[in-house]
Amino acid sequence: MVARLVGLSERIESVAFSPDGSMLAVTGGLPGRMGEVQVWDVAKRSLKISVPVTYDTLYGAAWSPDNTLISFGCSDNTLRAIRVRDGKQVLLMGGHNDWVLDSVFSRDGKQVISVGRDMTAKHTEVESERLIDNLTSITPGALKGGIAAVAGHPTKDEVLVGGSDGQPQVFRLKRQTARKIGDNANLVRKFPRMPGRIWDVSFDPAGKQAAAVSSLNGDGMVTIYSSDYDSGIPDDIKKIFNKTPNGGEKQKLEGYWAREVSELHSIEMPGVEIFCLAFSPDGRILAVAGADGTVRFIEVASGKVTREAVAVKIEGEVIADSVSEGEKRRLNRKRGKRAEISERTISPNEISALVLDPAEIVLTKPNHYAQILVTARLKTGGRVDVTRQVFTEVSGGLAAITERGQVKPLRDGEGVLAARIGGIKVEARLKVTNVHSAFAPDYVRDVKPVISR
């Protein structure tokens, strides 16, 4: 290890060296609280600038070719860029419909290409902050899932993208045919599909080969492709792009997109998900890393792993847990595993009245729940939350209540939920129905909010 660069971020989502190698950009933040862009001086091992942005972690740092700008994606569905000199925001593009996961500058530094969970790759002009176009097709089903990674071609105005569908694809930045509804004319090539979700992609320095990494069910995959292809569009293909293709023409397009690209090596990584990769400057070695913290160096010509290095060496076999056997575990504030109470206990003698909110609780489905809040009005005039201190009881066993005041249905009926401290008591009406009804989940209402593309 050469150095440890310690900033404010609890989570690091991306790192990128500047083109001249003098600086390191880092995006991450405090999940659910703050996003942060860090810029480090590599030689001095010192922080040049820290820029807080949005209220969640940031993704996909990328440098402009002249080392002056850094672009990145945000979970508020925006693409942004800042000036390295003073941290000033110079680009804000809000055209995405979901988290923006990666970005890359064009070769001239005048545009930024961004990808995200909304299944699109978008092309944005830096100076005007204007969304130029979607590179990916807007046809339903053209892409089957979000896009997690994008990389620029070293010699062409093209980008390589990869995501949930497991198929790396190359798109051109400049449209060469008139737009037609349903076309996918910016697509240059489709590489053979790989298992699982793609997490990172890259061209080698010459652009003659490409690589992608993915994971599925706890296993990783590294695939190296030949990418020495002609980007020109033949006249017969242009004619198809200029109209709505029939079945035979669609097959012809698929053949064109698969032309001159092939899989060279497919390297399985059993038991370890692989998330990132990088080519060496001479293109002979591909470094990949994943969930086990080990960097593996693969010889591109043979596809063999030639060396492994542990990113952080752990001395001894001490588990990161200072709680001895039999000792009560502390509250894990990151995961909320336990509800241990450390607040001051309110005496009944201090309370003039209790207030329970809501005054009426109605649970109409087996998976419904309600959160109650019990507030103590103090004789001194103040108010205190005593939800975690009250003794609760429900008539007829209609519902269960957790220590934090979450009410879950157990059986149908009507009754009363009571909360008390000492002799001071407050009640709320409770009605529970349809506890034993079959639950029919709705995709939009119940499933979509908790899954990721």
Task: List where the protein language model places each region.
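WD40-repeat beta-propeller superdomains and closely related acidic/aromatic-rich repeat-like regions
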Residues: 1-334
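Extracytoplasmic soluble-region selector
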Residues: 331-452
